[in-house]
Amino acid sequence: MKIIKKIFLAVVMLFAFASCMNGPINLTGSAAPINPSQKKVLVAYFPEYSAKWRDDLELSFESRKWKVNEIDFWEVEKANLRKRNETFLIVVDKMIKEDYKSFLGGTFFSGNISVYDLRTGNKIINYNFHTEESFDVTTRLAKALGGLVTK
């Protein structure tokens, strides 16, 4: 009977762990593959909590050899983005900081991140998230865009 309880507990723990994990960020639109030389992103951060998101996003992308440039959040609509060298525009919209921290000390946020392909002007990612760590979000975002790079 003890062994059955342990197996049952292990199965319940496995389901609990699996349900808490967030999956990969998927492309909502179509984007053509890019060359490694095109690994350039332009980022617009909403001013609130921008330092935290800037640090995490730069770490996630620069560790994967992406070039990260910034533009003022309020200048995005005015700028002629097609004349820039970057391939993608990442807009980190207003974030809501949750009241609690993770086990390892990370900060949880809820909000929205949009990614636009500057070659076509199309939105390729619209990621609404709730109660996730900023570093986890930026890492999955870097992996999603990294999937477009051809070798």
Describe the role of every protein-language-model region.
Residues 64, 74-131:
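Surface-exposed short loop/turn segments
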Residues 2, 27-31, 75-78:
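A generic local structural motif
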Residues 1-20:
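Sec-dependent bacterial lipoprotein signal peptides
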Residues 13, 34-36, 106:
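Generic structural signal for beta-strand residues in well-ordered domains
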Residues 9, 32, 102-104:
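Residues embedded in well-ordered secondary-structure elements
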Residues 36-91:
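N-terminal segment of the mature soluble domain
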Residues 46, 50-54, 104-106, 130-138:
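Solvent-exposed, acidic/flexible segments
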Residues 21-37, 60, 65, 118-151:
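C-terminal/domain-edge helix-coil "capping" segments
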